């Protein structure tokens, strides 16, 4: 295996016009690449590997080209109507799409069942390194679950904030039942959204909760994800 990371550049183009832009620049070569598939195409004379993937909830491509062609590809996409965006925009989009981020919502301390990915855990393969552990976890009820959070009061559920049971007015500080792992303001749903882990018994859709936002217990609700679906 040869590592070619430093020999290549990758630019992601995402959004409702992304596929059309790439299709026009590749003379239709990209049109046969289906969602979650990889193919090759020439984009304005640049040999490229295209992955019909992304982390925004939008359709589009992640385009890999030789490193010395990265600037040319960037300029070509801009001249064709693409607009630059940074990680802040990407983070809002992936949250709206309900896509968890490793390092925030997933980690080496997370198991696939509490994160909602149990259906993808295969542990029947012979000599599987993690098979016994996954099987043991699958046979017990998890203490917590990853859920979608939607603010019904005014505030943003930022990463690290404590999630409390809904007990406004009955105690000075309601019981802590979890913690926010990702959160932002969503212009699409016009409000604060996020993800977090809560005790299993509070994980049902529709459960009312409060989130401690700088000392204020702001009302929120457990909701299904995605918050908004584009494709």
Feature map (PLM): residue ranges:
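Conserved, structured C-terminal
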Residues: 1-231
